[in-house]
């Protein structure tokens, strides 16, 4: 409900106050904020992503990862999780490890790998290396890029 008010065109003059309040509430607002990303450009969503990033809580990454399945917002979710920094590494590794256990959605797996590369978390190397022989060329290429970003070679 608060997110609806924050997003309402009639509340533009109070938007700053709503934004501050949403940041103070914390990770619980993430699913609602992610829900309003659809159909908007990254530019239009910059304030929404700023809220998600400023919450700076590993829970936000966990809450955002399922939205990688929605092609409409996936690239924006990749960008936002990448901005969360090291706090998002463990949740992202766990998501990748869960996907490896079953034959999964290749674009989603590719985005998770891309996030790990952007986060540059050395803890991800082992999980990524285990995918270096994956049957999908897209996954192998994403793994190579991510490992290069993490290691620098």
Model-derived regions, located:
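Structural detector for internal amphipathic alpha-helices that build alpha-solenoid repeat scaffolds
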Residues: 4-27, 32-57, 62-69, 74-87, ...
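TPR/TPR-like (Sel1-like) alpha-helical repeat modules
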Residues: 129-135
């Amino acid at each position: 409900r608060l997110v609806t008010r924050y997003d309402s065109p009639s509340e533009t003059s109070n938007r700053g106050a709503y934004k501050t309040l949403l940041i103070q509430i914390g990770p619980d607002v993430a699913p609602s904020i992610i829900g309003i990303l659809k159909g908007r450009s990254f530019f239009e969503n910059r304030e929404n992503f700023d809220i998600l990033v400023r919450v700076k809580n590993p829970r936000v990454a966990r809450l955002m990862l399922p939205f990688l399945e929605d092609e409409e917002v996936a690239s924006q979710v990749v960008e936002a999780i990448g901005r969360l920094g090291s706090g998002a590494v463990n949740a992202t590794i766990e998501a990748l490890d869960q996907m490896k256990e079953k034959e999964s959605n290749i674009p989603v797996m590719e985005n998770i790998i891309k996030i790990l590369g952007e986060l540059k978390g050395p803890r991800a190397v082992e999980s990524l290396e285990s995918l270096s022989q994956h049957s999908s060329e897209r996954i192998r290429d994403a793994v190579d890029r991510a490992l290069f970003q993490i290691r620098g070679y």
